[in-house]
Amino acid sequence: MTGLLASRLRAEGARSPTKGTDIPMRQPSAEDLDAAHQLVSSARGGRDNVMNFRSDRQEMTGKALDNTQGDGSRNMDSQLQNGHKAPVEQRAGESPPESGANPIDHPTSSKKSPKAQSKEQAFTGHSCSNCGTKRTPLWRRSPTGATICNACGLYLKARNTDRPTHRSRSLLTPYGSSSAQTLDKSRSSTSPTNDGNDPRLTDTWSNYAVKECTPSGSCPGGGSCNGTGGAEGCDGCPAYNNRVYKSAARNAMALHTPRTSPQVSTQGGPGSTEGDAGSSNPETMTLHIACQNCQTTVTPLWRRDENGHPICNACGLYHKLHGAYRPPTMKKSIIKRRKRVVPAMREQSPPSATQSSNGSVSPEASPAALAHNHDSHRQYQNVEHGNGHPPPHTRPLYSHAYHAPPPADFTGYTSNVISLPHHPPSTSQQLRPYDNNHNNGETTNTHRAPMPALHNPKKRTISESSIEDSQRPQASQILTHIPQINPPTPPSSSSASFPNNNPGRFNSISSLLNHPGEAATVTAHDRDDSRVDPALSSAVAPRTQQPQQEHQHASAGSHSPPRFSPSLSPAPPSTTAVPVGGGSGSGAAAVAGVVDHRDAKAERRARLQREAQDMREALKAKERELALLE
């Protein structure tokens, strides 16, 4: 292997002066080439020859490669002049493959110049045919097939014209101004792509910039716009905002434009600021972009024609619909805007807020008026009530007097008392489970209305439901002081004390299943019947009380046989008063309930008999009709 390396080095040293036979003689076979590469890399510390295929890339790059070679030769000449020629020749003698692969006329070169040239060829030698750049995130093709960069391609696609290579534009130059010609000449002389001889390349945009002669702040408003502002809703007007944006951008460019002029800079001293003073002189006014067709400066949207010239929205739409340019006679000084444009909310003074609340302003100011009314309404609520608690944010537009409906829990229905005209509630039963104003089991009357008088008691919050659950056992303990209806049966009285404290509700399910007591049941139904319409009590009472009546007589046994007399006289039930009530006051109430029950049952029986008789007569009439039809 050592002999092979020595022979290869001698062969390369012998053919190094010649450049044409370098590549064919260096690769006799693939095995020899691999072995030589391994030996060279191991002997020289793993250094690779980056210029082995430079000749191949030279054929692919063409004209772009010639420019890079010229740059490399200039860099090499500068290095030779600085005294680096001797070290370069020594390094070239030590590495014959690098010297043999160098396509430049000079046989020796430094190691830094090939690396710099390889970085310049990162995109395989592509260059933009419009601006000449060699670096871009995306290479594009022009309609003619030329290679262009991403910026030039997007510019051409959007404006249908080539992207200008010089970025200095005299957009703030009035017509017929001598300073404009001076700035154009100075700018064209400093541009790398314009030598000042071609008048078409000076700046085409300066032809579309006109002087603004309309006084600012004279917009009539109300849907009409002249682009000057000063009216209600001008902050949200697209024509006004577009015009302000364009003028601000051009004023910023005007501050930096005269500084690049060599004529202005050579004047020296105070004369060097004449360009800035001239551009900011109020006599020249603000310059805006103008339409190529009608020369207007006010439009909600700037468009471009097929030549890339800026045109207003009206001319662009007219050309798009009719295929011809819009006649200049159709130009109007005021633009009619649609009502769908929402203006920006501006701070209003108190008089304007008063007008907006009365609805006397234009529709454009309605959003700002609503916002101001909303704030004033919230302030009025805080001042009027003076409680230091602002209204909830979820309902800012409702009156503060409207309270949220309390929770509706029908399981605690017995703890609430319904106030009726003929049955006023007692003071001991006025319990407020939703109030926190009870101390040691004692209740106090508050100003809050009962729950059934509220508007929408269907929803409740989590806090209110938790308060209700915590207060429900206390309410059940307070109700235990109600006097018992049937003293001889303590279990029934204790179980019936809670569900019967509210006369407006039937017994609970537990009391119906466990049959708490005869007298208690009759008394409850008696009070229920007194609250029901008399016309309906006779129909409802027998259905609900018939099973209880049978249970009552079964429990009485042989003490009193049941009597079903249609008579309305209260004398016969006196025989049953002693066994049921035991001679107490509760027994008298039970007797009255039995009498009412018998009277209702008799009325029910008589009505059923009448209905049955009517049905029989109707059936006979239908049978006669059938007989006649047959």
Curated annotation (Swiss-Prot):
Q: What is the effect of changing C131A?
A: In gzf1; decreases both the number of zinc and iron ions bound and the ability to bind DNA
GO cellular component terms listed in the entry, alphabetical order:
nucleus
The answer to whether UniProt assigns keyword Lipoprotein to this entry is: no
Basic and acidic residues bias locations: 595-609
Composition bias (Polar residues) maps to 66-82, 115-133, 175-196, 258-267, 349-363, 504-513
**What does the UniProt entry state concerning the protein's domains?**
The conserved cystein-rich region (CRR) localized between the zinc fingers is also involved in DNA-binding and transcription repressor activity.
Protein name, entry field:
GATA-type transcription factor SRE1
Q: Which organism is it from?
A: Ajellomyces capsulatus (Darling's disease fungus)
